Amino acid sequence: MIGLPHYLVVAAILFTIGVFGIFVNRKNVIVILMSIELILLAVNINLVAFSAYLHDVAGQIFAMFVLTVAAAEAAVGLAILVTFFRNRGDIAVDDASMMKG
């Protein structure tokens, strides 16, 4: 049977991959956004796993809110990225400091 430690190990692996992706690929904005999504997925797995382990629904409800915020963050981030690519022709992180506003 799959227990709480299995979920925690999977979440820890996903969190580590996400942090590793941010530190290794600092130049590519798309990889940074995907790594942030992996980190949020690991947090959601922890929330749902502990919620099921403790027989409490609050963690699962909070995970739904985190998923909603993550979807909005991804949509806004990709919209800014598309606009930035149309204006500059490149999506390097170094050029982000040249944005107006």
Curated annotation (Swiss-Prot):
Q: How does it sit in the membrane?
A: Multi-pass membrane protein
**GO CC annotations, alphabetized:** NADH dehydrogenase complex; plasma membrane
Which Gene Ontology BP annotations are present?
A: ATP synthesis coupled electron transport
What is its quaternary makeup? Answer: NDH-1 is composed of 14 different subunits. Subunits NuoA, H, J, K, L, M, N constitute the membrane sector of the complex.
Instruction: Work out whether the entry's keyword set contains DNA-binding.
Output: no
Protein name per its UniProtKB record: NADH-quinone oxidoreductase subunit K
Please give one Pfam family short name: Oxidored_q2
Q: What is its EC number?
A: 7.1.1.-
Its recorded reaction(s) are: a quinone + NADH + 5 H(+)(in) = a quinol + NAD(+) + 4 H(+)(out)
What family does the Swiss-Prot or TrEMBL record give for this protein? Belongs to the complex I subunit 4L family.
Molecular functions (GO terms): NADH:ubiquinone reductase (non-electrogenic) activity; quinone binding
The record's principal subcellular location, in a coarse class, is membrane
Q: Which superkingdom heads the taxonomic lineage of this protein's source?
A: Bacteria
Q: Where in the cell is it found?
A: Cell inner membrane
Organism expressing this protein natively: Caulobacter vibrioides (strain NA1000 / CB15N)
> What InterPro entries does this protein map onto?
NADH_UbQ_OxRdtase_chain4L/K (IPR001133), NUOK/Mnh_C1-like (IPR039428)
Membrane-spanning parts: 4-24, 30-50, 61-81
Q: What is this protein's function per UniProt?
A: NDH-1 shuttles electrons from NADH, via FMN and iron-sulfur (Fe-S) centers, to quinones in the respiratory chain. The immediate electron acceptor for the enzyme in this species is believed to be ubiquinone. Couples the redox reaction to proton translocation (for every two electrons transferred, four hydrogen ions are translocated across the cytoplasmic membrane), and thus conserves the redox energy in a proton gradient.
Entry's HAMAP family?
Answer: NDH1_NuoK
Q: Kindly report, in one word, the top-level EC class recorded for this enzyme.
A: translocase
